[in-house]
């Protein structure tokens, strides 16, 4: 099984504020855990918003993730899922944030379980398997 970690899971791990996430991450080989281009963009946005002394450290942490874990792109298959998911959520009147929609589409397209603490929002997406590693 592949696990796609959402930004909040990676941030908790990198900041060492979510020991449960770090523990669960250590239980899986790096080949079972992935990033995606949208999450990477969110992490890099956080790096750019960091104060100058912290920015170098944060950039190094994100670079280490990029070296250790595969990053899945938003490709044509994900675009197909995006269209279906967005149409479903729009019709149901239960839209989610635009970045979350892209992340969900990438997870579904690649058969990944999405690891997030934001289960309330992501649970609206049909066919998306979720796990919250921040829970004990």
Positions of the model-derived regions?
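Acidic, PIN/NYN-like endoribonuclease modules and their adjacent C-terminal/linker elements
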Residues: 1, 104, 108-136
């Amino acid at each position: 099984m592949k696990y796609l970690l959402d930004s909040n899971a990676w941030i908790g791990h990198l900041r060492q504020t979510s020991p449960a996430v770090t523990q669960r991450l250590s239980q899986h080989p790096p080949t079972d855990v992935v990033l995606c281009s949208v999450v990477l963009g969110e992490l890099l946005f956080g790096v750019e918003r960091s104060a100058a002394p912290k920015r170098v450290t944060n950039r190094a942490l994100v670079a280490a993730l990029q070296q250790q874990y595969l990053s899945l792109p938003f490709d044509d298959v994900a675009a197909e899922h995006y269209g279906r998911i967005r149409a479903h959520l729009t019709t149901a009147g239960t839209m989610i944030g635009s970045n979350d929609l892209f992340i969900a589409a990438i997870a579904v397209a690649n058969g990944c379980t999405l690891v997030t603490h934001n289960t309330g929002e992501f649970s609206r997406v049909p066919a998306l398997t979720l796990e919250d590693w921040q829970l004990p």
